[in-house]
Amino acid sequence: MSSADKNLSVFSTDDLPDLTGTKFAIVVAEWNSEVTEKLFAGAYQTLIQYGASAENIIRGNVPGSFELTLATQWYASNAQVDAVIALGVVIQGDTKHNDYINHAVAQGITQVNLNTSKPVIFGVLTPNTMEQALERAGGIHGNKGDEAAMTAIKMIGLKPKIDQLKG
């Protein structure tokens, strides 16, 4: 939850997993590419910074945010992909179109998480204006692509800890 005076793209990096051999898919909506390219750059750089290798980061492009759901399902269903990051931007318009898209994508990505038992990260911005979107793609509110990548890393690290509880 971002506020006017807070940049949330600062994370605790305690206890992060070793990402050697971990494969990520980043699915990027082409609509509003001025923003989504910055989100992708942030996510990619964060994965590299914390130990992922470039050859283990796969990029897939989709026309718009609505298509993120199916593409994330395809990637998450692939046994070789460990986590999927969905990046998009749906800006408020004059109609309720954005409400329908945002709800469908959020619900769809939630369902992909549950169906595949893999981290599928919702990195879709839902701003009122392009200015707000840019503020969250490397501007005063940080880069939500960074946050999506860190969320994927932390979720990958959590699963083995939970599995150990089984004994």
Where are these regions (language model features)?
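Glycine-rich phosphate-binding loop
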Residues: E67-I109, L165-G167
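Glycine-rich phosphate/diphosphate-binding loop of Rossmann-like nucleotide-binding domains
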Residues: S12-V62
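Electropositive phosphate-/nucleotide-binding environments in soluble metabolic enzymes
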Residues: S33, E37, A41, V62-F66, ...
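SAM-dependent methyltransferases
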Residues: M1-K23, L165-K166
